[in-house]
């Protein structure tokens, strides 16, 4: 019977578990894991290569070296399984038990675990309430700690030096006990009564008032409560027994030449054992205390090094002077266990090769080299050979395959038919980086790739390599075919645009074929059908671009949808079109009108065309259509014979005069500068602006010349038509190149940037066609090198950003259909500077409406709440001019531990409502991270040519309507009768006749208004103008200027321009002022009226004070008369640097990391009225009196710019001091919706600048994850501590429980965490540990006895389960459901039998699967 049971033992059932718990192991636990004590430091006998007994590789402890064979060879073979050899003591079993059997070392003296000592904050320190330094002194035998003070005046845990100790012993004798080393600390830990301490701390927390104490107590309470809850004893932080890793995990490999390669751990263990044995011997010999003490200290250090080398003091080094790799180093970092072996594994059945273009493939195919396929599909071929009886054994089959007999090739064809393979191109930045294809066998050694999937893989054929992977199981093949097949992934998940858009030569071919020419051969002919056109074209009667009339048959959707009616019906109509378009109409899918093709097909048009096809005709038709477009494009491009030659680059004749005029203007500015009318900075700004404009002008002239050409029409008159110049066609079609690049070829290269981003003011007036001279070439190398340097740096940064994003969102999965919330956000079109940057339709497409969408004119409901707004809906909404729609958003979704489909809306990569199980978090992270890398790789394409927009200096209306000013707009009328704006946040709206807002423009401070409130204007009317180069300081009151604190050499400096010799007063930076006194004063102006009295602000007793900021150039003199609206000083704006995602990527990172900006603007904490209090040294005091009359004070540094004036009403959350916004303030004062709007808009700004489209919802998903913690403000009756940060879902669960039990729930504030912080503070310790700061995370988790419920994707990958997303979510759900039903059945049976046992069965509280230790 026992043998039978043993047989069962062999097959290890894989454990099913739902959670993993981590904790501290007690000494007994460690002994129970162990299979024996390691007593000797020996490893293996280097003559016999057999492990030494009781050593680190002992076979008696860890198991046999060979399968089923004991060490001495007495028992061999399977029949002795389980026997323990009496001679060598080795159990006869599998050798692989040496990978799992642990040993232990009994330490002669206890040793502190370094992680709990040194990993900050020190847990030992917290529990004992001692400082880390003191504990260290005790542990390393430098001081005594009092354990029992007895009747003496000493205190427990008091530290004393050796000298003190001996004095006290003389004084008190053995009244008290003090110890040294880990024994002492262990005694102290044992003495702690946790329950009592927790009670005391809770009462202290309630009674204490000091912030510092509250913080300290809360921290300590948290740790102690964790001990209390988890049942872990604090003294287990001190080791008495040290576990020994199984030997196969720290191997010792003999090299040839009698040397050994060994894991560093063996060295570290040897040291521990040696010191431990020496200590044992010293203790037996009753050696002097000082020697024993030294040995104990050395043992402590040896164990420290084994656990975490280098954490304390110098790292232990091996023979070759490099630090040894300890246990902690094994798991942390990129090369550690988590990231190297658990999250990224190497897989078999894979190969890689160079890719070449496969233009004859269908979209779902790839060409696989025969030899590769033969190797990859070997097992399948062996199987087939055996089944067919060609080979009798695997060995024979192997031989067949090696000889590559004809039958093998036939079988290979059969095996790979309909067996998809996966292709992957590194770096895999988004999910389209891995797609499945059906292999087609080809000769040669390169993989053939379909040209249309290149965009998704970001692949090109200049030597890129791709990897092939074979899905083996049937399920894997099915998933690859349904989810990953290239023809099922035709949209980008980032923005829902088609990813299979033709590019380069395909675009050129299609464009060339759909252009029209004036007076081409056969113009004006009429044809009865497309076939006739083709015949005429083949017989050279017409050209591709000839204008002709053709009768074209379109297949339109049948209105009659009854049974048996055809889906499409033909519709014939006569079109005026061109030959090329008529020929292309053959491939149009059913359901698309000919009008979509009846225009020149540029890249954008083709993208739109494919998009329309996808929405109207479905996936299959679109894929076929795209394939046919590609074939036609290649064919037509070949036939077109377009080429580039130097003569295509036409330099405009007016170039010289344009450049000459600019040079004259620059001279004029130089002259003005010399005579002191402008500052150096202003001169530089203006010069750069002139050259930008010149560059534009030359470019424009060049494009005008390139883009049209003169022709004679049919009537013999000369007219102009769009040019057939090759270079122009390439750029215009979007095939390659851009207007900027053509301008460098044939216009002028323009301004160049230095590596720091500032612009060199002498432009390169030559172009590449004329050639650059040496100086010009030298200037341009600057930018080119910067581009290359940037690329290298930014790729790494972008990859790290993606990694952080993935980590923070990896556990966000769609888990239910609808959470039923009624919250959402109001979406409006995004308008900047009067331009609609993003239309409303784009922002609400694919979202679910949360309130009914109502027709503004008839007030009838168009779409009920809960409708998914698709293309037709958003077009209708746009047509009716609805300007705001409330939609669901991931931010307000009420699903716990996930998202619901309705709040997320459309899955952009599939074009329909998102499926339950979709890992939307990872998709969001990829969508934001992928372009980051793309962009950073693209900085250098403009060759550093400074692409800087000329600065806006006016604003004009885009539409007809009525001007309205917002409530914040304030202006004064100056002596000339001009209206000067003195508000900083004023906006001008333009409304149509029924009062709907059409556009809105910010009007800056100091602008001159040209239109007033209520004026009716036409489109194109200027509303306001201003000087973009300087910021003025304007007075709102008239009077005589009286300077205060304007002392030369103290607060202001006389700047004498070295060129002009004229002087101006400039306010000096506070840091550069000499004396302490001058740092606190602020140069300012008061105004005196005719009687010499100070002018007061109307309605108050405060005198008008106008302060000058640092850097201001004061333009008035002391005692000068000024009028209302006059400029007192100017602040020159910084010279602008070129914008480029180089600045952009760090910006995105700092937004997602929620960093508070330096010198952040200050927001009003309450709604109320402002007034200025008494200024303190260096600060001015702003007071806001709220509606109840309470005063809130803000102290503001004097050099800051205050945006409010006296007695102004401000709203809570309004900016009162200028500066960049702090996201934490926005969340606190304006709420989640405002915060999300801020982050989304800011992130989108960066990407939009690069022309990258990302859907808002991806950014919202990330923001949701940044908001997943809350801070408890009042704990009610819950288990939380005030001030503690907890997971939102946890807190809501706990509150639900409290409400159900009729107790008081906790109240909380939202907290915004940066993505790194949010990843580390996740509930899953496995996920956090594999991200960053592994040691700290694991230490904390172990003390808390944390339990990881394996909710996210990462944790599950690490423990090797199916991830709870996609098909895995369904699997886990089914498993849980089955368990529940099994348990219910079990309970039922138990209940029926309960009366037999006479005991009612306890309900199964715990899940059946205990947490795996």
UniProtKB/Swiss-Prot annotation:
Enzyme Commission number(s) from the entry: 2.7.7.6
Top class in the EC scheme: transferase
Record text on cofactor binding: Binds 1 Mg(2+) ion per subunit.
SMART domains: RPOLA_N
GO CC, alphabetical: DNA-directed RNA polymerase complex
InterPro entries from the UniProt entry: DNA-dir_RpoC_beta_prime, DNA-dir_RpoC_beta_prime_bact, RNA_pol_asu, RNA_pol_N, RNA_pol_Rpb1_1, RNA_pol_Rpb1_3, RNA_pol_Rpb1_3_sf, RNA_pol_Rpb1_4
Keyword flag Oxidoreductase: no
Keyword flag Transmembrane helix: no
Record keywords, A-Z: DNA-directed RNA polymerase, Magnesium, Metal-binding, Nucleotidyltransferase, Transcription, Transferase, Zinc
Molecular functions (GO terms): DNA binding; DNA-directed RNA polymerase activity; magnesium ion binding; zinc ion binding
GO biological process, alphabetically ordered: DNA-templated transcription
Entry cofactors: Mg(2+); Zn(2+)
Subunit description: The RNAP catalytic core consists of 2 alpha, 1 beta, 1 beta' and 1 omega subunit. When a sigma factor is associated with the core the holoenzyme is formed, which can initiate transcription.
Cited HAMAP family: RNApol_bact_RpoC
Family, as annotated: Belongs to the RNA polymerase beta' chain family.
Function comment: DNA-dependent RNA polymerase catalyzes the transcription of DNA into RNA using the four ribonucleoside triphosphates as substrates.
Name of the protein in question: DNA-directed RNA polymerase subunit beta'
Organism the protein comes from: Burkholderia vietnamiensis (strain G4 / LMG 22486)
High-level lineage: Bacteria, Pseudomonadati, Pseudomonadota, Betaproteobacteria, Burkholderiales
Gene (UniProt): rpoC
């Amino acid at each position: 019977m026992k043998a039978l049971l043993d047989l069962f033992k062999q097959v290890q059932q894989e454990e099913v578990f739902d959670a993993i718990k981590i904790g501290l192991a007690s000494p007994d636990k460690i002994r129970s894991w162990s299979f024996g004590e390691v007593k000797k430091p020996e490893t293996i006998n280097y003559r016999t290569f057999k492990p030494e007994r009781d050593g680190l590789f002992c076979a008696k402890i860890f198991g046999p070296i060979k399968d089923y064979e004991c060490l001495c060879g007495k028992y061999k073979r399977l029949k002795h399984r389980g026997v323990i050899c009496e001679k060598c003591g080795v159990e006869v079993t599998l050798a692989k038990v040496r990978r799992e059997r642990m040993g232990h070392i009994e330490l002669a003296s206890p040793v502190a675990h370094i992680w709990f000592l040194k990993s900050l904050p020190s847990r030992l320190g917290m529990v004992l309430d001692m400082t880390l330094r003191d504990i260290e002194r005790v542990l390393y035998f430098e001081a005594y700690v009092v354990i029992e003070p007895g009747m003496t005046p000493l205190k427990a845990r008091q530290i004393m030096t050796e000298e003190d100790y001996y004095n006290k012993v003389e004084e008190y004798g053995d009244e008290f006990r003090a110890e040294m080393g880990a024994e002492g600390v262990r005694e102290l830990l044992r003495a702690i009564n946790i329950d009592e301490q927790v009670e005391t701390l809770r009462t202290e927390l309630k009674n204490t008032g000091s912030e510092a104490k509250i913080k300290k107590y809360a921290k300590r309470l948290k740790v102690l409560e964790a001990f209390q809850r988890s049942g872990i004893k604090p003294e287990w932080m001190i080791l008495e027994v040290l576990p020994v890793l199984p030997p196969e995990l720290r191997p010792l490999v003999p090299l040839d030449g009698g040397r050994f390669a060994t894991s560093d751990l063996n060295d570290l263990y040897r040291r521990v054992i040696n010191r431990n044995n020496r200590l044992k011997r010293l203790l037996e010999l009753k050696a002097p205390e000082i020697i024993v003490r030294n040995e104990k200290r050395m043992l402590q250090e040896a164990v420290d090094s084994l656990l975490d080398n280098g954490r304390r003091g110098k790292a232990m080094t091996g023979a070759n002077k490099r630090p040894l790799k300890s246990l902690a180093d094994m798991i942390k970092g990129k090369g550690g266990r988590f990231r190297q072996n658990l999250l990224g594994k190497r897989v078999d059945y894979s190969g890689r090769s160079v890719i070449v273009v496969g233009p004859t493939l269908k979209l779902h195919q790839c060409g696989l080299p025969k030899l590769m396929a033969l190797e990859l599909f070997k097992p399948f071929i062996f199987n087939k050979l055996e089944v067919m009886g060609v080979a009798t054994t695997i060995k024979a089959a192997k031989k067949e395959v090696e000889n590559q007999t004809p039958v093998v090739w036939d079988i290979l064809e059969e095996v790979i038919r309909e067996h998809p393979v996966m292709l992957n191109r590194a770096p895999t930045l988004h999910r389209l980086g891995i797609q499945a294809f059906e292999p087609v066998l080809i000769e040669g050694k390169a993989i053939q790739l379909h040209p249309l999937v290149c965009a998704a893989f970001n692949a090109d054929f200049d030597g890129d390599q791709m990897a092939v992977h074979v899905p083996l199981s049937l399920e894997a093949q099915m998933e690859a075919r349904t989810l990953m097949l290239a023809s099922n992934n035709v949209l980008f998940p980032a923005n829902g645009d088609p990813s299979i858009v033709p590019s380069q030569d395909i675009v050129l071919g299609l464009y060339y074929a759909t252009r029209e020419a004036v007076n081409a051969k056969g113009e004006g002919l009429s044809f009865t059908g497309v076939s006739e056109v083709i015949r005429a074209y083949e017989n050279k009667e017409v050209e591709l671009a000839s204008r002709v009339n053709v009768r074209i048959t379109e297949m339109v959707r049948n209105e009659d949808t009854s049974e048996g009616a055809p889906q499409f019906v033909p519709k014939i109509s006569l079109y005026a079109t061109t030959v090329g378009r008529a020929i292309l109409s053959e491939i149009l899918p059913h359901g698309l009108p000919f009008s979509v093709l009846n225009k020149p097909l540029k890249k954008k048009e083709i993208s739109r065309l494919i998009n329309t096809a996808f929405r109207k005709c479905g996936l299959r038709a679109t894929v076929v259509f795209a394939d046919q477009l590609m074939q036609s494009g290649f064919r037509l491009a070949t036939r077109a014979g377009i080429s580039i030659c130097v003569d295509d680059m036409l330099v405009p004749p007016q170039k010289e005069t344009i450049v000459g005029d600019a040079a004259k203007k620059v001279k004029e500015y130089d002259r003005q500068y010399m005579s002191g009318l402008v500052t150096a900075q202003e001169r530089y700004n203006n010069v750069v602006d002139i050259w930008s404009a010149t560059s534009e002008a030359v470019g424009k002239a060049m494009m005008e010349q390139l883009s049209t050409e003169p022709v004679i029409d049919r009537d013999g008159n000369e007219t102009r038509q769009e040019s057939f110049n090759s270079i122009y066609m390439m750029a215009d079609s979007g095939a390659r190149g851009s207007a900027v690049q053509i301008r460098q070829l044939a216009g002028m290269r323009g301004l160049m940037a230095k590596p720091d981003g500032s612009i060199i003011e002498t432009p390169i007036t030559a172009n590449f066609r004329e050639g650059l001279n040496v100086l010009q070439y030298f200037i341009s190398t600057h930018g080119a090198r910067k581009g290359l340097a940037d690329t290298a740096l930014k790729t790494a940064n972008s990859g790290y950003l993606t990694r952080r994003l993935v980590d923070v969102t990896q556990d966000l999965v769609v888990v239910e259909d609808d959470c039923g919330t009624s919250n959402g956000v109001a979406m409006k079109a995004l308008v900047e500077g009067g331009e609609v940057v993003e239309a409303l339709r784009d922002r609400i497409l694919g979202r679910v409406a949360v309130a009914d969408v109502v027709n503004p004119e008839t007030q009838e409901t168009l779409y009920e709440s809960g409708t998914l707004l698709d293309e037709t809906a958003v077009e209708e909404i746009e047509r009716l001019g609805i300007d705001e729609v409330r939609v669901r958003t991931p931010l307000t979704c009420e699903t716990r531990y996930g998202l619901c489909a309705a709040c997320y809306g459309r899955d952009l990569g599939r074009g329909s409502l998102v499926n339950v199980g979709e890992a939307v978090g990872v998709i969001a992270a990829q969508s934001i991270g992928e372009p980051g890398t793309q962009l950073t790789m693209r900085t250098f394409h403009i060759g550093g040519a400074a692409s800087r927009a000329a600065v806006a200096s006016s604003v004009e209306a885009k539409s007809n309507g009525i001007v309205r000013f917002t409530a914040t707009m304030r202006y004064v009328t100056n002596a000339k009768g001009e209206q000067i704006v003195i508000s900083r946040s004023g906006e001008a709206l333009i409304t149509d006749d029924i009062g709907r807002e059409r556009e809105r423009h910010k009007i800056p401070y100091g602008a001159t208004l040209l239109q007033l409130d209520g004026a009716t204007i036409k489109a194109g009317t200027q509303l306001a103008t201003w000087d973009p180069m300087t910021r003025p300081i304007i007075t709102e009151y008239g009077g005589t200027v009286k300077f205060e604190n304007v002392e030369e050499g103290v607060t202001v400096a006389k700047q004498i321009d070295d060129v002009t010799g004229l002087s101006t007063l400039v306010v000096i930076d506070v840091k550069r002022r000499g004396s302490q006194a001058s740092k606190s004063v602020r140069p300012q102006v008061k105004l005196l009226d005719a009687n010499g009295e100070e002018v007061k602000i109307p309605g108050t007793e405060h005198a008008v004070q106008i302060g000058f900021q640092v850097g201001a150039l004061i333009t008035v003199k002391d005692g000068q008369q000024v009028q209302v609206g006059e400029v007192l000083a100017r602040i020159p704006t910084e010279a602008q640097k070129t914008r480029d995602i180089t600045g952009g990527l760090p910006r995105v990172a700092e937004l997602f990391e929620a960093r508070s900006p330096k010198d952040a603007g200050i927001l009003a904490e309450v709604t109320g009225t402002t007034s200025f209090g008494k200024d303190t040294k260096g600060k001015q005091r702003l007071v806001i009196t709220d509606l109840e009359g309470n005063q809130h004070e803000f102290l503001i540094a004097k050099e800051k710019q205050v945006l409010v004036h006296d007695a102004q009403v401000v709203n809570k959350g309004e900016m009162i001091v200028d500066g960049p916004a702090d996201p934490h303030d926005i969340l606190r004062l304006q709420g989640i919706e405002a915060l999300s709007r801020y982050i989304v808009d800011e992130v989108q700004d960066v990407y939009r600048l690069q022309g990258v489209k990302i859907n808002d919802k991806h950014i919202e998903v990330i923001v949701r994850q940044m908001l997943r913690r809350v801070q408890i403000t009042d704990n009610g009756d819950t288990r939380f501590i005030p001030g503690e940060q907890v997971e939102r879902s946890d807190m809501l669960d706990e509150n639900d429980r409290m409400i159900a039990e009729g107790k008081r729930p906790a109240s909380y504030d939202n907290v915004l965490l940066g993505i790194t912080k949010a990843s580390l503070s996740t509930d899953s310790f496995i996920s956090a540990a594999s991200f960053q700061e592994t040691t700290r995370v694991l230490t904390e988790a172990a003390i808390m006895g944390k339990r990881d419920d394996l909710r996210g994707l990462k944790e599950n990958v690490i423990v090797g389960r199916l991830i709870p997303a996609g098909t895995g979510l369904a699997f886990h759900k089914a498993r849980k459901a089955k368990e529940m039903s099994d348990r219910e059945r079990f309970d039922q049976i138990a209940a029926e039998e309960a009366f037999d046992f006479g005991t009612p069965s306890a309900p199964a509280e715990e899940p059946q699967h205990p947490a795996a230790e």
